[in-house]
């Protein structure tokens, strides 16, 4: 119950936000049921791909809900498209988070990464890549070297399949004249 008219708008906004969160939680639960392997895959890849540097860190999400929160926070398509869930489930690509180490819980960039550490996409707010990403390039190269040392033969085989699928997808986009 709202006793003061001036608080009505605030209370309305709070309730709308609660409803959005509840809807997103239900959507995350449905996606997690549909793609049951994702949480396990995230646990499995965490020791290989997670890495902390002085300025930047690579964080592995714990599952569907973390990925959806990242997409919502950065207002981009990760977490809204079955294509990403399918790629994770098939271990064709993984979604990882590039964060500033000092603000480890604050979304910065979302990465789509192949099993060998090849970065397919780097996106921040509104599917953009800003100039500030150049500051992280050296860190990302360092991270890729570390990941390369951690890979198993199975990871390398998955990476080869992933590369072929990526090239096929690019060719299909060219044929469809999608820019």
Residue ranges with predicted function:
Residues 1-179:
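Catalytic-core elements of nucleic-acid end-processing and repair enzymes
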């Amino acid at each position: 119950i709202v006793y003061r008219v001036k608080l009505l708008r605030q209370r309305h906004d709070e309730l709308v936000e609660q409803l959005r969160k509840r809807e997103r939680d239900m959507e995350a639960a449905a996606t997690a049921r549909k793609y049951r392997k994702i949480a396990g895959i995230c646990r499995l890849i965490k020791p290989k791909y997670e890495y902390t540097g002085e300025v930047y860190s690579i964080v592995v999400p714990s599952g569907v809900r973390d990925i959806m929160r990242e997409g919502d926070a950065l207002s981009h398509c990760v977490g809204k498209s079955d294509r990403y869930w399918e790629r994770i489930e098939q271990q064709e690509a993984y979604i990882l988070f590039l964060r500033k180490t000092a603000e480890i819980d604050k979304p910065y960039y979302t990465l789509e990464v192949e099993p060998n550490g090849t970065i397919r996409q780097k996106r921040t707010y509104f599917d953009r890549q800003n100039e500030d990403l150049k500051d992280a390039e050296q860190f990302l190269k360092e991270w890729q070297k570390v990941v390369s040392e951690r890979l198993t033969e199975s990871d390398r085989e998955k990476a080869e399949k992933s590369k072929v699928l990526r090239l096929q997808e690019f060719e299909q986009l060219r044929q469809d004249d999608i820019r």
